[in-house]
A protein has these predicted regions:
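Short helix-capping/turn signature of helix-turn-helix
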Residues: 63, 130-136
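Generic hydrophobic, amphipathic alpha-helix propensity
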Residues: 19-32, 48, 69, 73-77, ...
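Short, hydrophobic secondary-structure boundary micro-motifs
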Residues: 127-130, 167, 171, 193
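Hydrophobic alpha-helical connector segments
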Residues: 72, 86-121, 174, 178-181, ...
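Amphipathic alpha-helical packing segments from all-alpha helical-bundle domains
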Residues: 79, 83, 118, 128, ...
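Amphipathic alpha-helical interface segments
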Residues: 30, 34, 51, 58, ...
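Helix-turn-helix
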Residues: 26, 34-68, 72
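C-terminal peripheral helix-coil segments that are non-catalytic and often amphipathic
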Residues: 1-11, 113-117, 121, 153, ...
Length: 223
């Protein structure tokens, strides 16, 4: 007698695991919306649960507290920012070719433009990620500063190769330049959040480029 076929889920992750991941994702996205509209301090776990449309107690099946979900919210927000701002700039293929000063400046200018466009279209995101969330506690400050260090180190890698090839002057500290370029992206974003428009942004970028370009080019190229 043939044994009846047993019904099973087949390959892949168990349904419970998939449902858990889906619910966690929903809660993270809901917390992101709540934190960027109400502010982290004013928001509650009940607000997050209501945003998803679930009971208050269900939140605690997935996260222990409002602070516990914050790390995932920060990761979610940073992923959005980096994807929209950097694009494929930091992909391995983009890091392997020799960069020129003009290309570096174009990359920086493009990043500034995209950050300002985000500040126009989603000002709550920029306000939260740049100003509100970093001040919550030391642990979060360390994480965000660590990300800045990674980005600055990536720029340093670009610049070090350009120094070796003679494109960029060899008497500048490329690590410091990486941090300077990151810092220079903040003022136009703040101006945009305060209502500054395209003309103001373009003037800032042109001024920064006029200062940066001769300061980075090799002495031979400037002569």
């Amino acid at each position: 007698m043939t044994e009846p076929a047993k019904r099973g889920r087949g390959p892949g992750r168990p349904r419970d695991e998939q449902n858990t991941e889906r619910r966690r994702r929903e809660l993270i996205e809901a917390a992101y919306r709540v934190f960027t509209t109400k502010g982290y301090a004013a928001a509650s776990t009940a607000d997050i649960a209501a945003e998803v449309g679930i009971g208050y107690g269900t939140f605690y099946r997935y996260f222990d507290s409002k602070r516990a979900i914050l790390d995932d919210v920060v990761d979610y927000g940073l992923d959005r920012l980096l994807t929209e701002i950097a694009g494929d700039v930091f992909e391995p293929a983009a890091l392997d070719h020799e960069i020129t000063v003009d290309e570096l400046i174009r990359t920086w200018s493009g990043a500034v433009e995209r950050m300002c466009h985000i500040a126009e279209s989603d000002p709550a995101l920029m306000q939260a990620m740049l100003f509100e969330l970093p001040g919550i506690d030391d642990e979060l400050n360390t994480r965000i500063l660590g990300l800045g260090g990674i980005l600055a180190a990536t720029v340093d890698r670009f610049l070090s190769r350009a120094v070796d090839s003679g494109v960029i002057r060899d008497d500048v500290n490329t690590g410091d330049v990486g941090w300077m370029l990151l810092a220079l992206t903040i003022p136009p974003v703040m101006r945009t959040l305060q209502g500054g428009g395209e003309t103001d942004r373009r003037r800032y970028i042109d001024t920064a480029v006029a200062v940066l370009t001769p300061g980075l080019r090799s002495l031979e190229a400037n002569s």
